[in-house]
Amino acid sequence: ILYNNLERKGRENMTLEWLAHSCFCLANEEGHRLLIDPYRGEDTGYKEPQLDKVDVVICSHGHMDHANTAVIQNPDYMKIDKAGHFETKGFAIDTVPTYHDDENGTKRGENLVSIVETDGLRFCHCGDLGHVLGKEQVKALGKIDVLMIPVGGLFTIDAKQAAEVVEALDVKIVIPMHYKTEACRYDLAPVEDFLEEMKKSEYAISMYHDSVMHLDGYTIPKRAKVYVMESKY
């Protein structure tokens, strides 16, 4: 897949849906669906989704607000919960080992940052990243079209650290996740803290009043931009 072809490649059916918390569902042009970090309702406070026709699920770590595969109704899906390279259903997936805390995993264990490439676009989901990325990790992630990053602190990087990660990466679209909302039971910081940090670096910010982003050729901005989506649940 050639990165520089992304502006010319048709993606009429490609969508990214934010269900809630850190859970996203990516559908490629072929109609295959990749789910990331499905949550359990009783842990998070969000309504629990019931999903069918999921082809791949990525769990960044084993905590049940990120690894509740019981929400998937069909039995025949591929589960990825370890570091490595995987290819299936039009998705090329690389999972990069990181930590859930800033003490090399001694507090909360390991975490996977996932790179998903499909239909000429590269997506990066940071899971419950607990530390700022090192130079080698940044290099390994490469160019990113859409970044999903936790910003609420407490269990993950906070707003300031998230802004630092964004600054270090070559990214076009930034989608904050894992922050305090009306439904969320965790004592996380609100997304506004992250937006204030991004304004300091003069990033454009858009309130995207939908849970589904249609990833056609006109969606990808030429300059990095923050999109605050509305979750489905």
Predicted segments, located by residue:
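Binuclear metal-ion centers of metallo-dependent hydrolases, dominated by the metallo-beta-lactamase
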Residues: 17, 108, 173-233
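Metallo-beta-lactamase
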Residues: 69-119, 202-223
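Short, Lys/Arg-enriched N-terminal segments with co-localized hydrophobic residues
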Residues: 1-13
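Active-site-proximal beta-strand elements of phosphoester/diester hydrolases
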Residues: 15-18, 33-37, 92-98, 113-115, ...
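Conserved acidic residues
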Residues: 54-55, 145, 172
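Short secondary-structure boundary segments
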Residues: 61, 151, 177-179
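Active-site-proximal loop/helix segments of hydrolase catalytic cores
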Residues: 103-169, 186
